[in-house]
């Protein structure tokens, strides 16, 4: 494969796991836009910067030289030489990342970082196939009911299912402006499917 594949979807739709597996099968790097937004949220929390302070947050990100290391097996985010990756999937980051991702300046900053990576690659996020890589050769949008997505996330986090579902519904409401399928994307409800089945479905469409 020599082009770009985009895999978009709401939170906990399985897009990250699918994108990693698809990238590995194709032998190309995997790009996670969400990891950059999470890094911005984490750094804002750690530095005491208001997540809604666009100017202050951009100054922080540029000053730390935040960058994404794209690899087929997963991504890492570095800031001033420090690997932040293990700090980015926490309930605290979950609760502020949507506010950070709504800032136009931060979205532009993330998009610049992503566009620095030469194709081929598999990119996952919420608007990869619409705002970032509209020229992608293959576009997919994965979704599932809020209940299914909350159940998946609760298995990964030390949180009760009910709390995860509440957080997820709030995030869906905040993210709905950014999270919509491209007109030419293939849409798949993954609720009744295994990871292997979703990966096989995506690969089958790419290899047609």
UniProtKB/Swiss-Prot annotation:
Record keywords, A-Z: ATP-binding, Cytoplasm, Kinase, Nucleotide-binding, Transferase
* Keyword match Ribonucleoprotein: no
| Superkingdom assignment | Bacteria
Give the catalysed reaction(s), semicolon-separated. CMP + ATP = CDP + ADP; dCMP + ATP = dCDP + ADP
In Gene Ontology terms, what is one molecular function of this protein?
dCMP kinase activity
Which residues are noted in the entry as ATP-binding? 9-17
Where does the protein end up?
Answer: Cytoplasm
Instruction: Supply the CDD domains for this chain.
Output: CMPK
InterPro entries hit by this protein: Cytidylate_kin, Cytidylate_kinase_dom, P-loop_NTPase
Q: Which Pfam families match?
A: Cytidylate_kin
List its EC numbers.
2.7.4.25
Annotated Gene Ontology cellular component terms: cytoplasm
**Which GO biological process entries does UniProt record here?**
pyrimidine nucleotide metabolic process
HAMAP family associated with the record: Cytidyl_kinase_type1
**What family, per the record?**
Belongs to the cytidylate kinase family. Type 1 subfamily.
Q: What is this protein called?
A: Cytidylate kinase
Species assigned in the record: Thermus thermophilus (strain ATCC 27634 / DSM 579 / HB8)
Organism ancestry: Bacteria, Thermotogati, Deinococcota, Deinococci, Thermales
């Amino acid at each position: 494969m020599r082009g770009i594949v985009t895999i978009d979807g709401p939170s906990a739709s399985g897009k990250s796991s699918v994108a990693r597996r698809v990238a590995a099968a194709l032998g190309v790097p995997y790009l996670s836009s969400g990891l950059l937004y999470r890094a911005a949220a984490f750094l804002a929390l750690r530095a005491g910067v208001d997540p809604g302070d666009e100017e202050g947050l951009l100054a922080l990100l540029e000053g730390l030289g935040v960058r994404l290391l794209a690899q087929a097996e997963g991504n890492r985010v570095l800031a001033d030489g420090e690997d932040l990756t293990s700090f980015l999937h926490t309930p605290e980051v979950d609760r502020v990342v949507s506010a950070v991702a709504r800032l136009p300046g931060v979205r532009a900053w993330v998009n610049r970082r992503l566009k620095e990576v030469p194709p081929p690659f598999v990119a996952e996020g919420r608007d990869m196939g619409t705002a970032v890589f509209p020229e992608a050769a293959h576009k997919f949008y994965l979704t599932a009911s809020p209940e299914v997505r909350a159940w998946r996330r609760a298995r990964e986090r030390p949180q009760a299912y009910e709390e995860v579902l509440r957080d997820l519904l709030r995030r869906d409401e905040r993210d709905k402006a950014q999270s919509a399928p491209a007109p030419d994307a293939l849409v798949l409800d993954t609720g009744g499917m295994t990871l292997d089945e979703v990966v096989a479905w995506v690969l089958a469409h790419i290899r047609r």
